[in-house]
């Protein structure tokens, strides 16, 4: 990395995570820096915008979905790995949206869709998306009883009344 890339001011960016029935909304990027990769809807901040405002604006621009109640989920310092890259400070928010809103790709999103974590891991995704989905999966309560409880027969929910 050259010294010019090191001294440039980082750009602020935000993205929005929306979960619906165990699926997460992703867009396929049409433009660099992540062209043809899948990511949460998001992008660069405009002057005077808070990170939460950026996440909601980018969500609406890229998918047509109006989000609300953004809650900071994770932050990333995305340092460039070559001279042409830009340094970003990325804020990722969990966002609420009406369940009947359809995602329609627009702006710099070439496509939009809802994906399970397993499907996401098979797609070309930035490391930040992989990390967020792994963290979300760890936070999500299991819908299956543990194998240990099944083997030992100690889980009271498994016993007949």
Model-derived features: positions:
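Conserved N-terminal beta-strand and adjoining loop/helix that marks the start
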Residues: 2-25
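Active-site-adjacent beta-strand/loop module that shapes the phosphate/pyrophosphate-binding cleft
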Residues: 76-102, 135-136
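A short coil-to-beta-strand element that immediately follows conserved catalytic motifs
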Residues: 66-75
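Conserved Nudix-box catalytic region and its N-terminal flanking loop in Nudix hydrolases
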Residues: 23-61, 161
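Nudix hydrolase/Nudix homology domain
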Residues: 33-38, 102-161
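A generic structural micro-feature
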Residues: 6-10, 37, 83-89, 106-109
């Amino acid at each position: 990395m050259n010294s010019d890339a090191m001294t440039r001011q980082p750009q602020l960016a935000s993205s929005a995570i929306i979960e619906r029935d165990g699926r997460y909304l992703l867009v396929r990027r049409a433009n660099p820096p992540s062209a043809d990769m899948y990511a949460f809807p998001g992008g660069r901040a405009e002057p005077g915008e808070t990170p939460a405002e950026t996440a909601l604006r980018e969500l609406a621009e890229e998918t047509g979905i109006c989000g609300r109640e953004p809650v900071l989920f994770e932050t990333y310092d995305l340092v460039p790995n070559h001279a042409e890259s830009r340094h970003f400070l990325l804020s990722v928010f969990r966002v609420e949206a009406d369940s009947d809103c359809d995602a329609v790709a627009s702006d710099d999103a070439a496509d939009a869709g809802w994906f399970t974590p397993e499907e996401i891991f098979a797609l070309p995704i930035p490391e930040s998306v992989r990390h967020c989905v792994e963290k979300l999966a760890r936070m999500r309560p299991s819908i299956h009883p543990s194998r240990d409880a099944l083997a030992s027969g100690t889980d009271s929910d498994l016993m007949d009344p």
